[in-house]
Swiss-Prot record:
Gene it is expressed from: AEP2
Outcome of mutating residue 413 to P: Suppresses a T-to-C nucleotide transition mutation in the 5' untranslated region of OLI1 mRNA localized 16 nucleotides upstream of the OLI1 reading frame
Main function: Required for translation of the mitochondrial OLI1 transcript coding for the mitochondrial ATP synthase subunit 9.
Alphabetical list of InterPro entries matching this protein: ATPase_expression_mit
Species, as recorded: Saccharomyces cerevisiae (strain ATCC 204508 / S288c)
Name assigned to this protein: ATPase expression protein 2, mitochondrial
Keyword Transit peptide: yes
């Protein structure tokens, strides 16, 4: 009750009077409610977001924000409402950082450490606590870090505008954070003390950001920062941290599938080596580093041994997905098959459909199935084994949800596996398309629009001349396309125009003018697009008629030349005959 009264009367005198008591009682109360454990070192017993939320609650009450009541009430929410990260919940009522302040802080990243630290303190004072502070505490910087991460896309745009290095700004922020972490331990003589759960959470947040930027070297340095201070964080059943293990597998065991070089059979030319492509090369949501090497294979086997024994690790979708990719990148497909059989009871040997199987880990998801498909294709250069295991998953786990990323990867891999010399009509890719339609129809769902999926199917349609496939694609995605166009998705709009023009061109070339009119009426989507398509159609019809006219005239010309040549030969024959 006294905490609520304090929030209602936020005078500075009352705040200073109760600061010490508030910290002590708040921590004690949070422990009683189960929000904070008795020890912050054994962080694996409770979820990391619990510690982050506890720190955020105390920090928010101390800085006297109006939205602190929402944070306190969040403790009593049900588990279903607390599925997101603690920082995301805390940001729900937060104040976004204005553009002017962001520009100032980004510009300061080129200064020395002291000036950058002062700029960060200014940012905290302007956005969180107006009371000036000479030195920003680690808790304050942790809170500020979460705010900056939620606005990372805006920060990236500002960096482009002022010609600042976005990645350098974040690494400077990490350097300041690491300095405060070590300084905190020096002050209380805890140099050998491990990082607590909130510090590990913050470090992993920055690793995730650098992986998205394709700055794997900087991500490696932050990972080393965690491992040097918490050497048992990967292999200890008690202290294992899932996010750190996932990032270790991604950075040091090859579990970043978008970076893998995949052979593309569809572009292979006779006498030339197969072209190697990367799955994430066309994805604008991430940047790819120019090099990617996996290093630590021994630790991978130890992590796998731990993961297959610990229930909390088996229930992590992210961990199992990255573990599968690591085995795929290492080429250990036999170990991968045994892991799949151990966790989900799925084997390359077909089970009878009436057999009831039980999974030991998390329920199979789209992310896990993508990892399985990519891993087997990476080693086999063929989809046969991956698709056979996929069929078993769909049969024995009917509730598995296949999202847009799954279908994107399936079409990418089927396109790469397609050999035009052996399959001119790309029946393997078309079969995957029908599989996708059947799955969505069985679930009574509409397929979600994905640019890369549309692009892969467009390439197949154009290479094979299979315009009925293009019409079928537009028909299936029509509701999603209309919704996406309303949101001004430029890339999707451009690929749709390519579909339309390619189909109109094929129909006009085949003389199916009534079908062209029906197509434009059905898939014009709006008045402007319909007008543009009619103009394009009229131009194609004019070019076709001109081409046909030239063809007829050329045929007449050739016939005339042939007749003239025949007459000359006949005259020559008559002359020679008379001489004889």
């Amino acid at each position: 009750m006294w905490i609520n009264r304090l929030v209602k009367h936020p005078s500075y005198s009352v705040l200073r009077f109760y600061t010490k008591r508030l910290c002590t009682v708040s921590v004690k109360s949070l422990r009683e409610f189960g929000v904070l454990p008795n020890s912050t070192i054994c962080h694996s017993v409770y979820p990391r977001r619990t510690y982050v939320m506890g720190r955020a609650v105390i920090n928010d009450i101390l800085i006297k924000k109006s939205y602190s009541t929402h944070t306190v009430c969040a403790i009593d929410r049900s588990k279903d409402e607390n599925n997101g990260s603690a920082y995301d919940k805390f940001e729900a009522k937060g104040i976004p950082i204005d553009v002017h302040t962001l520009k100032r802080i980004i510009s300061s990243s080129g200064m020395d450490e002291s000036e950058f630290s002062k700029s960060i303190s200014y940012l905290f004072a302007k956005t969180v606590d107006p009371e000036p502070k000479d030195v920003l505490s680690l808790e304050d910087l942790s809170f500020l870090l979460s705010k900056l991460y939620t606005q990372r896309f805006q920060i990236r745009r500002i960096c482009r505008d002022i010609n600042a290095k976005y990645s350098e700004f974040w690494f400077k922020l990490f350097s300041l954070y690491a300095e405060k972490v070590d300084a905190k331990r020096n002050q209380v003589n805890l140099r050998n003390t491990k990082l607590d759960a909130c510090e590990i959470f913050d470090a992993n947040l920055m690793i995730k950001n650098f992986i998205e930027l394709g700055q794997l070297g900087k991500a490696q340095k932050i990972l080393s920062f965690i491992l040097d201070r918490n050497p048992d964080i990967l292999l200890s059943p008690k202290n294992a941290d899932i996010s750190t293990i996932v990032h270790f597998l991604q950075l040091r065991c090859g579990a970043l599938a978008p970076y893998w070089k995949i052979p593309d059979n569809s572009e292979q030319k006779q006498g030339f080596l197969r072209k190697m492509v990367r799955l994430g090369a066309k994805n604008t949501s991430i940047r790819l580093s120019s090099t990617y090497k996996a290093m630590d294979h021994q630790t991978l086997l130890k992590i796998a041994d731990l993961a297959l024994q610990e229930k909390k690790l088996l229930n992590s979708e992210d961990l199992l997905s990255t573990l599968i990719q690591s085995f795929g990148h290492l080429g250990q497909t036999q170990i991968l098959e045994r892991c799949i059989e151990h966790i989900w009871q799925i084997s390359p040997q077909e089970f009878p459909s009436h057999v009831v199987i039980k999974h030991r880990g998390c329920y199979p998801s789209s992310k896990i199935l993508v990892s399985i498909l990519v891993s087997f294709y990476f080693n086999d250069h063929d989809l046969h084994r991956g698709l056979s295991i996929l069929d078993s998953f769909i049969k024995h786990y009917p509730d598995v949800k296949l999202d847009a990323l799954f279908w994107r990867r399936l079409f990418q891999l089927s396109h790469f596996a397609w050999t035009p010399a052996n399959d001119k009509k790309a029946t393997s890719v078309v079969r995957c398309w029908h599989l996708m339609k059947q799955w969505y129809a069985s679930k009574r769902l509409r397929p979600s629009v994905d640019y890369e999926t549309l692009r892969q199917l467009y390439d197949i349609m154009k290479k094979t001349g299979n315009f009925p496939l293009g019409i079928d694609v537009l028909r299936s995605f029509k509701p999603g396309i209309e919704r996406t166009r309303a949101e001004n998705a430029g890339k999707v709009n451009n690929i749709i125009i390519k579909y339309q023009k390619c189909i109109i061109k094929e129909l006009v070339n085949r003389g199916r003018f009534s079908a062209v009119r029906e197509f434009i009426d059905s898939y014009g989507f709006d008045r402007k697009m319909t007008k543009d398509l009619n103009i394009f159609c009229a131009n194609r019809m004019f070019l076709r008629s001109k081409k046909m006219k030239n063809k007829i005239e050329n045929k007449k010309e050739r016939e005339k030349v042939r007749l003239d040549s025949f007459d000359d030969d006949e005259d020559d024959g008559m002359i020679i005959g008379s001489l004889w």
